[in-house]
């Protein structure tokens, strides 16, 4: 059985929501909710938070989680994941779990990680969910993905893909969780930045344009993510409905 490491990148200096990982949802911080829900995964061998901020690091340690300090110079979350992967050499699959999804379902993590484990020929795995609301399909901030018959990504775009010109075909929204083959992850930054990546502002297109396979795990629903204080209020109401926090 391959050893699988889950990594939750957590930055304090978010431009739209400074201090976001430490925002309170009930009596717990958002990073604690994310960590505790991710730890319910049945396939992760280890779970760590990767942060460049000592405040986040100390909060994670205080609630009993594992945290590692990383450089503050990383231009992306992927670079932070690479630094952590270099510190944990015994893991062959690395799962990048978004720190701003406090209600993440363990089944999503299990699905993405297991898909990567069962397809060593693919460099990466990620997830998608059926896109049923057309207004969301044309939303530039919601990334769409086209999937081939073998469950592999053909292309990711912020635009509406595929076109609904002649017939209505299923639409899928990409979810920001990734399972990486360790060897591929460590060489990722040596791949040249692609024109597609620059055009769409989507890192995963670097792998696509270089000819690497990305498997897609189809999830039934997308969880709520927090980008702004307004998003946090939506999550708080959702947690109340779930009876995870009190009214």
Curated annotation (Swiss-Prot):
Gene3D superfamilies: Spore Coat Polysaccharide Biosynthesis Protein SpsA, Chain A. Keywords: Cytoplasm, Lipopolysaccharide biosynthesis, Nucleotidyltransferase, Transferase. It catalyses: 3-deoxy-alpha-D-manno-oct-2-ulosonate + CTP = CMP-3-deoxy-beta-D-manno-octulosonate + diphosphate. The keyword Cytoplasm applies. SUPFAM superfamilies: Nucleotide-diphospho-sugar transferases (SSF53448). GO terms for biological process: CMP-keto-3-deoxy-D-manno-octulosonic acid biosynthetic process; lipopolysaccharide biosynthetic process. Pathway: Nucleotide-sugar biosynthesis; CMP-3-deoxy-D-manno-octulosonate biosynthesis; CMP-3-deoxy-D-manno-octulosonate from 3-deoxy-D-manno-octulosonate and CTP: step 1/1; Bacterial outer membrane biogenesis; lipopolysaccharide biosynthesis. It is an enzyme of class 2 (transferase). Activates KDO (a required 8-carbon sugar) for incorporation into bacterial lipopolysaccharide in Gram-negative bacteria. PANTHER family: 3-DEOXY-MANNO-OCTULOSONATE CYTIDYLYLTRANSFERASE, 3-DEOXY-MANNO-OCTULOSONATE CYTIDYLYLTRANSFERASE, MITOCHONDRIAL. NCBIfam families: kdsB (TIGR00466), PRK05450.1-3 (NF003950), PRK05450.1-5 (NF003952), PRK13368.1 (NF009905). HAMAP family: KdsB (MF_00057). Belongs to the KdsB family. This is 3-deoxy-manno-octulosonate cytidylyltransferase. The lineage of its organism: Bacteria, Pseudomonadati, Spirochaetota, Spirochaetia, Leptospirales. The gene is kdsB.
């Amino acid at each position: 059985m391959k050893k699988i490491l889950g990594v939750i990148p957590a930055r304090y200096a978010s431009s739209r929501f400074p201090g976001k990982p430490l925002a309170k949802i009930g009596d717990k911080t958002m990073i604690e909710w994310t960590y505790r829900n991710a730890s319910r995964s049945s396939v992760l061998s280890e779970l760590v938070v990767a942060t460049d901020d000592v405040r986040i690091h100390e909060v994670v340690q205080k609630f009993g989680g594992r945290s590692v300090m990383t450089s503050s110079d990383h231009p992306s979350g992927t670079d932070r994941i690479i630094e952590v992967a270099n510190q944990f050499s015994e893991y062959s699959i690395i799962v990048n779990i978004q720190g701003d999804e406090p209600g993440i379902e363990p089944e999503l993590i299990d699905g993405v990680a297991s898909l990567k484990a069962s397809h060593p020929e693919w460099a990466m795995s990620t997830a998608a969910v059926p896109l049923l609301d057309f207004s969301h399909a044309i939303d530039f901030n919601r990334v769409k993905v086209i999937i081939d018959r073998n469950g592999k990504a053909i292309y990711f775009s912020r635009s509406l893909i595929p076109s609904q010109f002649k017939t209505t075909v299923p639409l899928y929204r990409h979810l920001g969780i990734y399972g990486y083959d360790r060897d591929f992850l460590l060489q990722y930054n040596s791949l040249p930045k692609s024109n597609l990546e620059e055009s769409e502002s989507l890192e995963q297109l670097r792998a696509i344009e270089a000819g690497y396979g990305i498997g897609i795990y189809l999830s039934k629903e997308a969880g709520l993510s927090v980008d702004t204080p307004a998003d946090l209020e939506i999550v708080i109401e959702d947690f109340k409905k779930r009876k995870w926090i009190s009214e």
